[in-house]
Swiss-Prot record:
InterPro entries from the UniProt entry: GOSR2/Membrin/Bos1, SNARE, T_SNARE_dom, v-SNARE_N_sf, Vesicle_trsprt_v-SNARE_N
Pfam (any one): V-SNARE_C
Cleaved signal peptide residues: none
Variant or mutagenesis effect after changing A141S: In VTI1-12; blocks constitutively the traffic from the late Golgi to the vacuole and blocks the transport to the cis-Golgi compartment at nonpermissive temperature
Ranges in the topological domain labelled Cytoplasmic: 2-194
Subunit structure and binding partners: Forms SNARE complexes with the t-SNAREs VAM3 and VAM7, and the v-SNAREs NYV1 and YKT6 on vacuolar membranes, which are involved in biosynthetic transport pathways to the vacuole and in homotypic vacuole fusion. Forms SNARE complexes with the cis-Golgi t-SNARE SED5 and the v-SNAREs SFT1 and YTK6, which are involved in retrograde traffic to the cis-Golgi compartment. Forms SNARE complexes with the t-SNAREs TLG1 and TLG2, and either the v-SNARE SNC1 or SNC2, which are involved in traffic from early endosomes to the trans-Golgi network (TGN).
Protein's UniProt name: t-SNARE VTI1
Classification of source organism: Eukaryota, Fungi, Dikarya, Ascomycota, Saccharomycotina
Chief place of localization: membrane
Natural source organism: Saccharomyces cerevisiae (strain ATCC 204508 / S288c)
Domain of life: Eukaryota
Family: Belongs to the VTI1 family.
Length: 217
């Protein structure tokens, strides 16, 4: 494992624990402090997703063993689920419309003027939009991961096809070599047989001449 990957993992774990602790403290905080805490947690959540992306890139670049790479990618998927369950959902539950009354419950409504109320509602709307953007980003990330996995599978399949084709070419080359050797052997035998045939014909002609010579002598 590369030193950069170890550093990313350490930063991820530290940021994750800090975000959990902030979410645990937020419900008991005054409204102004709570809003600040939630914004900070939102930033930490973005950092966590960024770290996962950076770790995924580093895994592809630094881990050559396919089995080890697959194991680490499974760990990244588990961490992504942890962010969803331990950070994103609790954060959303504190900022969505269903929890608005609880978020403002510790304030006396009669003491809040219109400007303050409008500011609170504006902050809530901003958090709501941020939550929607996070949902879209998560959906796009999942789709991208699926496309990337499919591309890797296609590349792996093409590599296997090329390997099989190369083996087939090696076998065909071996067969061609054997065929050439067989043809050379057959050619040598044909030449030898031709010389033998010429020799036999010459001997027969010689015998015929000897017979004729003996008769006319």
């Amino acid at each position: 494992m590369s030193s950069l990957l170890i550093s990313y993992e350490s930063d991820f774990k530290t940021t994750l624990e800090q975000a959990k602790a902030s979410l645990a403290e937020a419900p008991s905080q005054p409204l102004s402090q709570r809003n600040t805490t939630l914004k900070h947690v939102e930033q930490q959540q973005d950092e966590l997703f960024d770290l996962l992306d950076q770790m995924d890139v580093e895994v592809n670049n630094s881990i050559g063993d396919a089995s080890e790479r697959a194991t680490y990618k499974a760990k990244l998927r588990e961490w992504k689920k942890t962010i969803q369950s331990d950070i994103k959902r609790p954060l959303q539950s504190l900022v969505d419309s269903g929890d608005r009354d609880r978020l403002f419950g510790d304030l006396n409504a009669s003491n809040i003027d219109d400007d303050q109320r409008q500011q609170l509602l504006s902050n809530h709307a901003i958090l709501q939009k941020s939550g929607d953007r996070l949902k879209d980003a998560s959906r796009i990330a999942n789709e991208t991961e699926g496309i990337g996995s499919q591309i890797m599978m296609d590349l792996r399949s093409q590599r296997e096809t090329l390997e099989n084709a190369r083996q087939t070419l090696f076998q065909a080359d071996s067969y061609v070599d054997k065929s050439i050797k067989t043809l050379k052997t057959m050619t040598r035998r044909l030449v030898a047989n031709k010389f033998i045939s010429y020799a036999i014909i010459a001997v027969l002609i010689l015998l015929i001449l000897l017979v004729l010579f003996s008769k006319f002598k």
